[in-house]
């Protein structure tokens, strides 16, 4: 089953979500199971390269989060998204003009084949790391997680694995093989993290922008939770409104026992924070976050 081989999957947009789940299982376990006339299992420790257009046929630029949005559409399960070492986009806006490409001559592939073959046949004990590599890796991995953690492409406990592979690739490209051993240094690690950052910040992928917006939304959510708790402590009767399916504006005055000016100010704050929305017949509908916090506070009081 192509054990320890390289596998390219082209036109992968034709695969169903279930097909991708099966391949992800193979990727994590290193084994493939066949259920036909008889059941069989074989080792399938492959390095996978996926090539695909967006599943829906839309251009990358049409997705709100550009290439990452297309990736989410193609691989909807977050756990499966995290299995990919690299997610690269090839969009029209990435390269308008081929600069420095001579279309009249064939590329010299023999040198690259030899380099690829040499790298592929390296064993684990032939890869040596400099004495400062481990400490530098810890710092670089922490910084990457600080900048891009919280999403599937940079996971704090596993990002060092991506950096290790990329660092080895950088060492191979530099030809840093001495006495039959690949010498990987902090210099290669620095280039690896720079390149990984470049791919994440690439406008056509938009992962960096996605993470920053995700963190902003999470911070706003926490601020809203703290504000709701403070209001419930100040006005315990507010819980009866927040746990209702809807309420009228005048009920704030009646239930909380506050004047119309204070009620209007409270309602305006709820609307401004996106915690209620307008409904039919001048009613207001609480956001799910309001319901969750109010119910949790009730549970805490009853404990």
Residue ranges and their predicted role:
Residues 1:
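P-loop NTPase nucleotide-binding/switch module
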Residues 4, 10-12, 22:
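Walker B catalytic acidic pair
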Residues 14-15, 22, 56, 169:
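Residues immediately C-terminal
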Residues 16-17, 58-59, 256, 294:
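Activation segment
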Residues 20-40:
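Conserved catalytic/switch belt of AAA+ P-loop NTPases
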Residues 34-236:
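Phosphate-sensing "switch" segment of ASCE/P-loop ATPases
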Residues 158, 174-185, 203-303:
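Terminal-proximal interaction/regulatory segments of ATP-powered molecular machines
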């Amino acid at each position: 089953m192509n054990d320890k081989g390289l596998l390219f999957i082209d036109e992968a947009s034709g695969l169903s979500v279930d097909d991708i789940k099966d391949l992800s299982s193979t990727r994590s376990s290193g084994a493939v199971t066949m259920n036909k006339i008889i059941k069989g299992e074989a080792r399938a420790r492959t390095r996978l390269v996926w090539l695909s257009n967006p599943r829906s046929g839309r251009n990358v630029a049409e997705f709100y989060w550009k290439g990452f949005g297309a990736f989410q559409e193609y691989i909807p399960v977050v756990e499966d998204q995290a299995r990919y070492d690299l997610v690269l986009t090839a969009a029209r806006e990435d390269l308008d003009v081929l600069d420095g490409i001579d279309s009249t001559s064939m590329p010299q592939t023999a040198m690259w084949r030899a380099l690829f073959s040499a790298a592929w046949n390296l064993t684990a004990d032939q890869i040596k790391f400099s004495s400062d590599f481990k400490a530098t890796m810890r710092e670089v991995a922490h910084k990457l997680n600080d900048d891009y953690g919280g999403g599937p492409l940079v996971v704090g406990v596993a990002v060092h694995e991506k950096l290790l592979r990329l660092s080895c690739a950088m060492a191979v490209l530099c030809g840093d093989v001495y006495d039959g051993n690949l010498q990987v240094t902090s210099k290669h690690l620095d280039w690896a993290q720079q390149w990984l950052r470049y791919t994440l910040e690439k406008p056509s992928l938009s992962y960096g922008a996605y993470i920053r917006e995700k963190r902003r939304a999470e911070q706003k959510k926490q601020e809203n939770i703290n504000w709701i708790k403070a209001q419930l402590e100040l006005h315990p009767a507010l819980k009866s409104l927040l746990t209702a399916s809807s309420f009228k504006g005048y009920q704030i005055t009646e239930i909380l026992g506050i004047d119309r000016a204070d009620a209007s100010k409270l309602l305006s704050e709820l609307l401004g924070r996106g915690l209620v929305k307008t409904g039919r017949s001048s009613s207001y509908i609480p956001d799910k976050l309001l319901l969750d916090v109010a119910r949790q506070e009730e549970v805490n009081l009853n404990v």
